[in-house]
């Protein structure tokens, strides 16, 4: 029976610890694999990524370009028809609240968009913020309705 105190790592999954400074013949004696002197041989002797020895670094030499709107852009969550087919019964009304209850939409979002990936055989009444043309066509072919909140 598997118990916490009997669990062992797979063979070859763990590396042996390097024993540094244990004599010259160990292969890791004297300088312990750090070479001779210099900043990288000292304790705490690492330089930050991108540091070029005092020269103006590349990321500061290149010009700033473009515009970044990630803090203010709308977060639109995607739902596919295949997910609706799997979760909802025929005749159901699908909106943001029912999608959250079914765990198809999680976390904060500004809008929900329905995409046409998959097939739909049930007639559903879908109320979303955005819908693709293929999704709208498939829902209406299955006998359902699509209401877009931004158009209403």
UniProtKB/Swiss-Prot annotation:
Keywords: Ribonucleoprotein, Ribosomal protein, RNA-binding, rRNA-binding. Residues 24-36 have a biased composition (Gly residues). GO terms for cellular component: cytosolic large ribosomal subunit. One of its GO terms (biological process) is translation. Pfam families: Ribosomal_L27A (PF00828). GO terms for molecular function: rRNA binding; structural constituent of ribosome. SUPFAM superfamilies: Ribosomal proteins L15p and L18e. Residues 1-66 are annotated as: Disordered. InterPro entries: Ribosomal_uL15, Ribosomal_uL15/eL18, Ribosomal_uL15/eL18_sf, Ribosomal_uL15_bac-type, Ribosomal_uL15_CS. Part of the 50S ribosomal subunit. Binds to the 23S rRNA. Belongs to the universal ribosomal protein uL15 family. This is Large ribosomal subunit protein uL15. It comes from Akkermansia muciniphila (strain ATCC BAA-835 / DSM 22959 / JCM 33894 / BCRC 81048 / CCUG 64013 / CIP 107961 / Muc). The gene is rplO.
């Amino acid at each position: 029976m598997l118990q916490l105190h009997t669990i062992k790592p797979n063979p070859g999954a763990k590396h042996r610890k390097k024993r540094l400074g244990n004599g010259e013949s160990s292969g890791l004696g004297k300088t312990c694999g750090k070479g001779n002197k210099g900043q990288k041989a000292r304790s705490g002797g690492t330089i930050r990524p991108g540091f070029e020895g005092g020269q103006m670094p590349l990321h500061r030499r290149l010009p700033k370009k473009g515009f970044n709107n990630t803090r203010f852009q709308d977060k639109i969550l995607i739902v596919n028809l295949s997910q609706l087919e799997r979760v909802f019964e025929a005749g159901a009304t699908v909106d943001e609240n029912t999608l959250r209850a079914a765990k198809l939409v999680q976390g904060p979002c500004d809008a929900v968009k329905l995409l046409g990936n998959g097939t739909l055989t049930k007639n559903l009444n879908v109320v979303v913020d955005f819908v693709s043309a293929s999704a709208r066509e498939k829902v209406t072919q299955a006998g359902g309705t699509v209401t877009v909140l931004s158009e209403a």
